[in-house]
């Protein structure tokens, strides 16, 4: 192998790494933007829900009760999602252990 082949190989590896990093950065940015879209869609839904519940005849106390109830509902949903994520994480760990055992049994 001569120096020009080594240089080409080296630059090919550098280009591969650059492209790989850029792709990963784009994936992170896309994921971040999707999260922002979801968050803003939720805010729009929340405001629409408020418009549906709040009427001109509501007192300030009535509006506060509506907002408190909606807040409690959303907090309950967050708790449910936290529990579901914990269950999914536990299942993922168990599957990872099983896959590791399969790999070890294949090597033996």
Curated annotation (Swiss-Prot):
Belongs to the pole-localizer TmaR family. It comes from the Bacteria. It is found in: Cytoplasm. The gene is tmaR. InterPro entries: DUF496. Pfam families: DUF496. This is Pole-localizer protein TmaR. It comes from Blochmanniella floridana. Pole-localizer protein involved in the regulation of several cellular processes. Transmembrane segments: none annotated. The keyword Coiled coil applies. Residues 71-105 form a coiled coil.
